[in-house]
Amino acid sequence: MSAPLASLSHYKRIVIKIGSALLVDRGAGLKHAWLDAVCDDIAALRAKGVEVLVVSSGAIALGRTVLNLPGGALKLEESQAAAAVGQIALARHWSESLSRSSIVAGQILLTLGDTEERRRYLNARATISQLLKLGAVPIINENDTVATTEIRYGDNDRLAARVATMTGADLLILLSDIDGLYTAPPHLDPEAKLLPVIAEITPEIEAMAGGAASELSRGGMRTKIDAGKIATSAGCAMIITSGKLLNPLRGIDEGAAHSWFAPSAMPVTARKTWIAGQLQPAGILSVDAGAETALRAGKSLLPAGVREVSGHFHRGDTISVVGLEGREIARGLAGYDADEARRIAGHKSAEIEALLGYAGRSAMIHRDDLVMTEQTGRKAGKSTKKKDEAHA
């Protein structure tokens, strides 16, 4: 396992995710002093040669304040209207605050398809790369004016992880309302301990993550752990820390409490990073023990090892592979449509032509199109006792 670097200035490219509750106060609106302090931190990092990208929540929260919408859950059309108003205000505030340090901000609004569809993914990556090359700071958010319940990231933690892997960042920082991952909710358990270093996201670590989220923010510790799995598998370290300090990034360097998640020692290729990071696999293949062993040995997934096929997918779609314990172990690109996959599941590759009427591929998922998503072989450290949840 690699160790945390001594200073943020030792990283080359950092993605910073900022939640709505940190940026927006329900009664007073945008927290100007806090935003200015964060922008000062960003300017200090850039002065040391660090490239910085920001994934900023807050459009809906800011828009509902401007529009004086009532508290509680919003209808979809209300959220979209709030986002339309809030996005303009949010971008303006970021631009004005960064301009104090002569830094140009560039707004990018993404939808789920921009990271899930390969061509759009590459185009979005090229745009962000060009902004960085020109010296601008990309301010990224989900395009909530067009996103629907069915086609959305659902939270900016996972969006930030996708941006980090897309852009080849070596550190993702999630600013939260808590200073890291605890073994239990610290407000409920006086014995709860902060985990300063997480070597690997194991089932025990996942069990510590809760799903609580505030009214202003859709995310919780559960989504932060999901983000960590996406980022670390691509070789990107992750930090969860409190954003309540006026200068939270400077605070990390000055010793503020945080949890550091180690990047994988064997990050997957850029193409496999995209496959592994897909947020909505189109289907599921349940496999037997023999197939699971073969996949861990780097082999392709053959039809004989598939016990069950779920979902509706087409050849080339990303699908999830689930082992006997019901946990996802891999993801890959389907070699067959779902209906064909069901017909050949459990059969030998030599029988495919007789079953389908044509000689198709021998593998359900070829090893070149498959990436393991369940890490094995490393310990998570001493403080990995299973708890019900962690305060988010």
UniProtKB/Swiss-Prot annotation:
It comes from the Bacteria. Residues 282-359 form the PUA domain. Residues 373-392 are annotated as: Disordered. Its main location: cytoplasm. It catalyses: L-glutamate + ATP = L-glutamyl 5-phosphate + ADP. Pathway: Amino-acid biosynthesis; L-proline biosynthesis; L-glutamate 5-semialdehyde from L-glutamate: step 1/2. Its EC number is 2.7.2.11. ATP binds at residues 17, 176-177. GO terms for cellular component: cytosol. One of its GO terms (molecular function) is RNA binding. GO terms for biological process: L-proline biosynthetic process. SUPFAM superfamilies: Carbamate kinase-like, PUA domain-like. Substrate binds at residues 57, 144, 156. It is found in: Cytoplasm. Keywords: Amino-acid biosynthesis, ATP-binding, Cytoplasm, Kinase, Nucleotide-binding, Proline biosynthesis, Transferase. Pfam families: AA_kinase, PUA. Catalyzes the transfer of a phosphate group to glutamate to form L-glutamate 5-phosphate. Belongs to the glutamate 5-kinase family. This is Glutamate 5-kinase. It comes from Allorhizobium ampelinum (strain ATCC BAA-846 / DSM 112012 / S4). The lineage of its organism: Bacteria, Pseudomonadati, Pseudomonadota, Alphaproteobacteria, Hyphomicrobiales.
